[in-house]
């Protein structure tokens, strides 16, 4: 919320699930409506904030320090994460000899807001799982620690989304292109910023195609994780 500064998770669930409150994040039980969806997708400076009860809310990724926390609090035993970050690039470093443009800096800042926390949270969950796997359940029960292992499957793009965005900058309205061009946003290094502004069909179609290919590459993992018998390929 813009007034409180808290990351609020609105949820529906069984009566046994109690709302929670942590540092800078909280949960509120309420019937989910269209305004909650609009608020959760209200990108700053692009889509208008939505007022829910006493304050205005923006994109759900802002100040979301623990993105998987709501699923954990709601009792999830398995979490299927479809990310848009760079989980596959731990050992890949790009050379940068050219001073970063304003667009590149802005894209970097936006990534720190919308992408990085999810990857950090995934690593944290995996570390907790590893620790719990080394501690006998009887010890955890004796200590009274309400911790449990949570199975995760993480799928992330095999191609950088900012590279794809850089190839489709021409699909943006001319006014937006002109603005981006003045700060280096129409060059490859500015693709990160462009990816947050692109909602045109050529770009979204490319994302859908990439997502389909990556999902089919991991089809066996997905089938096993979801407990399915098989997955049908769509031409």
Which residues make up each language-model segment?
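Patatin-like phospholipase
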Residues: 1-235
